[in-house]
Amino acid sequence: MYTQFGSKIGKFSYLFGMRYEDSHIEVNQLTSNIYKPKKYNNFFPSAFLTYQLSENSSISLNYSKRITRPRDRFINPFASYTSNINLFQGNPDINPALSDAYDIGYLHKWDKVTLSTSAYFNHTTNSFQIVRKERGDQINGVPVIINTPFNLAIEDKTGFEFTLNYNFKKWFKLNGNFNFFNNKTTGNYTYTNSQNTLKVQNFDFNTNTWFTRITSKISLPHKIDWQTNATYTAPQKYRQGTMNGVAAVNMGFSKDILKDMGTISINVNDIFNSRKRIQDLQLPTVNSYSEMQNRKRQITISFTYRFNKKKTDKDPKQNKTKMAKAKIWDKILS
């Protein structure tokens, strides 16, 4: 259930919202005979304030309450194996994480360039943390490591973000995004190990990292569109190890055919086959190195046909209005 109220007074506009959610979740693992029903409800207020500095620039101040629900894998108690010595087991007792998100932003438009910047702070309780520990057995003398998510931390994330849209020519558009943030986490995990000894793991850590994305769209002769997307996630540290940086490039070509009633596309996902999750794990008695790749390079050819409707460009002003509304709804519903 959701309600909102907004208005504009001169150069100042505001939008207030309130969302209510009532959730019911049941985990029924027949193999392990585990049944865990969960019920929770929450109110999610939001407020968006904007002041128009000039025809081409504005500042904004926003707040929203957000929820991050555990994925299916996080609540499934059935173990899945990355290898015979490294397994992941979900936690049916895990709860959603709740965040208070604040940001202040600035937007400026030039003839061919649009710059959007923001500084933000997110405070999260019940943050998910993956606890890695020895299961107590060995395979060929190597300890078996089990990875399980728990709600055991408070997380404060502070950062800034830049987004730049550059319409160089009618046939060439470029979009860039850069996001830098500091992540401070506090929490402890207490458990009894395989030797029946009580252990306390401290999960306090403070780390900086960043992410960037560049997207280009070029209109080639014969009405062929060429789009390229490149991303890079910087290395990250966490309490029990490190994760290497990840770079990846996707590329696609598309062309409208059959009097713009159909579109044929060719897409290459992860051209350089570099989207790999590489981790170094350091436990008190075990060090491990792992590589994981969900999907290797993929090439996809597709054809889309639109019945009774041609592909047409809508009014640019109407598109901008819809995009602005979509961003607000993304913040409200996230």
Where are these regions (language model features)?
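Residues on the lipid-exposed face of transmembrane beta-strands in outer-membrane beta-barrel proteins
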Residues: 3-7, 47-51, 104-108, 119, ...
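Transmembrane beta-strands of outer-membrane beta-barrel pores
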Residues: 9-11, 20-26, 63-69, 78, ...
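Repeated loop/turn-to-beta-strand initiation elements of outer-membrane beta-barrel proteins
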Residues: 11-14, 56-59, 112-115, 171-174, ...
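Surface-exposed extracellular loop regions of Gram-negative outer-membrane beta-barrel proteins
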Residues: 1-31, 40-46, 55-101, 121-147, 171-182, 215-236, ...
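Outer membrane beta-barrel strand-and-loop segments of large Gram-negative receptors
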Residues: 1, 91, 95, 110, ...
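C-terminal beta-signal and adjacent terminal beta-strands/loops
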Residues: 255-334
